[in-house]
Amino acid sequence: MSKPWLFTVHGTGQPDPLGPGLPADTARDVLDIYRWQPIGNYPAAAFPMWPSVEKGVAELILQIELKLDADPYADFALAGYSQGAIVVGQVLKHHIINPRGRLHRFLHRLRKVIFWGNPMRQKGFAHTDEWIHQVAASDTMGILEDRLENLEQYGFEVRDYAHDGDMYASIKEDDMHEYEVAIGRIVMSARRFIGGKDSVIAQLIELGQRPIWEGIAMARAIIDALTFFAKSTQGPSWPHLYNRFPAVEFLRRI
């Protein structure tokens, strides 16, 4: 049987598909088992994020088709971190699992899927990365409204590594977190962090002009979001960082 393919997609701010980062570093640890196709032609841009995701989706679809059509005996695996997890999640949900999807013919060849800090995480579906952070609680899910569903019913294995406190991957169904979902929509559509009416800051201010009875939950959500972003400069204490080694072990079990 042919060596399986591993397709990896980096997170925001990591446009070099071969550079350091969770997906690429994980792939380098399993090159004795997998053929590796990192996804380039994808800007991994913070602003605007959704067009960046769409470019990643298009490139991942293209590479899967090229590699799997060329070798009908090869199985494959997917791995994505943060924005890259959105790319993988979009392709998995809408193009592989979907019976009308462009890649549905390859569903039976998909063996493993890995997410780290996944904004599309299915509610209650989380795995530990055996590191310093608590795994996300069973009543949490990803921040995007378009989430993965019913992953347990398919023939491929999934590891969705999610930390408690990772705002992208671990929110609850309550008033405060409804506003965090709104903040997630802002991040997807904003063209810059500050400056102009289409910036994150301008849209957060607009969000803050909701009726007073919504104010407490909204304020808590914004404070939570700003605290989360501020911690991004604090190294391993930021809950959106992950340990890759459980994923390496998972990929090696084929």
Curated annotation (Swiss-Prot):
Protein role: Endolysin that degrades the junction between mycolic acid and peptidoglycans in the host cell wall and participates with the holin protein in the sequential events which lead to the programmed host cell lysis releasing the mature viral particles. Once the holin has permeabilized the host cell membrane, the endolysin can reach the periplasm and break down the mycolic acid-rich outer membrane. Cleaves the ester linkage joining the mycolic acid-rich outer membrane to arabinogalactan, releasing free mycolic acids.
Name listed for the protein in its UniProt record: Endolysin B
GO biological process assignments: defense response to bacterium; killing of cells of another organism
Organism of this sequence: Mycobacterium phage L5 (Mycobacteriophage L5)
Keyword terms: Antimicrobial, Bacteriolytic enzyme, Cytolysis, Host cell lysis by virus, Hydrolase, Viral release from host cell
GO MF annotation terms: hydrolase activity
Family: Belongs to the L5likevirus endolysin B protein family.
Origin superkingdom: Viruses
Active site: S82, D166, H240
E.C. number: 3.1.-.-
